[in-house]
Design a protein with these regions (language model features):
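Residue-level hotspots at or immediately adjacent to binding/recognition sites across diverse folds
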Residues: 1-154
């Protein structure tokens, strides 16, 4: 679930996407939201006047500021299941199984840490830093989505 430009947007199984202006009355947006996908959408975030969804098999899709008209993005080589996404410092960062994917303001997708032995389950952004967490109590931080530092874990 994400909120941006006065809209709530939720995502889920089989590519389901729902949009609401008030948090109760929902509708299905056009584009990806209006059809069934063979992908589970695990996470969604808002940034740079866009919503980004992430899901199974490295699935990524982006929308305009109104939450309508989702468009599939090219899945980077090596990207696996993605579970969470965050926006900060003019980039989107998505994390998942052995995968960190960066979608920057120029629209380029670059897989980062795709060979990492850890599976990241969640990512957030605050105070100028991305923080990704995963199995075995690992925590990594990054300011640019490219260079990651392990700050905790086994």
């Amino acid at each position: 679930m994400a909120f941006g430009n006065n809209k709530f947007i939720g995502s889920g199984e089989e590519g389901a996407i729902q949009i609401s202006d008030n948090g109760s009355a929902c509708s299905t947006p056009t584009g990806l939201g209006s059809r069934t996908l063979e992908k589970t959408l695990n996470g969604i975030t808002f940034g740079n006047n866009q919503f980004l969804t992430v899901g199974s098999d490295g699935w990524l899709s982006i929308t305009s500021d109104d939450g309508d008209g989702f468009t599939a993005l090219t899945i980077p080589t090596g990207a696996k299941h993605l579970y969470s996404t965050a926006y900060g410092n003019d980039i989107f960062v998505a994390v998942g199984d052995d995968s960190v994917v960066v979608y920057d303001k120029d629209g380029l997708l670059d897989p980062v840490l795709k060979a990492n032995k850890y599976s990241f389950n969640d990512v957030t952004f605050g105070n100028g830093v991305f923080v990704a967490v995963g199995n075995d109590e690992i925590i990594y931080t990054s300011t640019d989505g490219d260079d990651w530092t392990q700050v905790h874990g086994k």
